[in-house]
């Protein structure tokens, strides 16, 4: 009896435990927890406020927990990032790019707009009577997603919606005709530059970068466009429109460029374009009409205080020292004109140069045009000995003995290294060195012509071997005076005393010591006019040959205004 009673007791306890062990319904996990559940590591639901926060009395502060940013989004402000709710809403779009309307709004809408927006349209009977036909009634069987843009939290959602639907002609036809205010609001350029724009970028960071560029264009040109309208492929892109012709007061301007101009403005734009086709802009042929044509002073655009240098219409070369002299005379003789020009804008210069076919014309060892000419005509080495003798004679004639001692100390620094490198060279090596020099000079000639920087090239003895046209305009020295036939000009003849001493010190430092062979310094250039000296910033680049011996120095100069 005891055994049977124990079996009955065990069976009863097993049945009771089976009833109590029924699996509890699992909570459905949500893709994003609220801030309180996330902090407590608890399971959350998709509702806001969630059930757990309602039970704990935290429903007023229940919101989505912030997610950890990606590295490429560390510097992006929070206001520009796309919210998670808008990202999820864009995934729920149907095939036509339409999403159901949000059930609640974060802030109340204006009464007029609220009365004109139905909250739900389950069938055709709720369509207003002013719908034009049954076809449009059938298309209005969904709630317009445009109403969701009244909530600040859903602005990005509206932009994402139009990302899929802006180019769809079917959906464009389904826009409710009884929402004219909303239609104009979303399909015309907005007056608010901070309003989110529709975009073709799937990456928020890429869209943010492009939106920033669009905002810059809006601020500078007064033309409010969306991110799609700012692309070169859009219909609103009009390179013929200048920023001055664009409207700035009309915030609801039409999107096409033909509607931005009146008939008179269109004719003016057409005539301006035709004018620019036949008249190539140049320093001597500009659209400005206020050119100061006084014969006493150089040609100048007084609206921007800009003087013209180089070749002129009369065939006369205007050089920088002459302009400086004229400005000084204007300052002394016509102070009113001088003050008027400088009060408008800072002093500036523009240069017009016509490059000759032979940049070193007239000299026996002129610049070769082709590399084949170099290897055919260079049959003997270049003699540096006469150059050194002429350099020493010039230095003794110009400088005092204390300065000559300092120059000699600088030369003594690199003289032993130079003797050691050249002691073992044969005549064929010296011929090859000269071929390398001419070949390098031919390559640099192409660079110097297109750089526009005043440039001069000299040998290691200081003898000038090449002069750019811009350097002649800067200093006023004629090219025939520097590298003409039977002329030997040294770089030290173009520098003042302090700059010459600095030159030898710099050359001794970079000749064999500095492998890069480039340095930047400041020097003063002499001009044919003894009363005019030009303070410049310069960069000297030393070029070595295959034997490691200094071959040439390239000097670039820019005036310090």
Swiss-Prot record:
Disulfide bonds: none annotated. GO terms for cellular component: nucleus. CDD domains: GAL4, PAS. It holds the Pfam family Zn_clus. Residues 440-514 form the PAS domain. The keyword Transcription regulation applies. Residues 97-151, 222-239 have a biased composition (Polar residues). SUPFAM superfamilies: PYP-like sensor domain (PAS domain), Zn2/Cys6 DNA-binding domain. Its main location: nucleus. Transcription factor which regulates nonfermentable carbon utilization. Activator of gluconeogenetic genes. This is Transcription activator of gluconeogenesis ERT1. It comes from Candida albicans (strain WO-1).
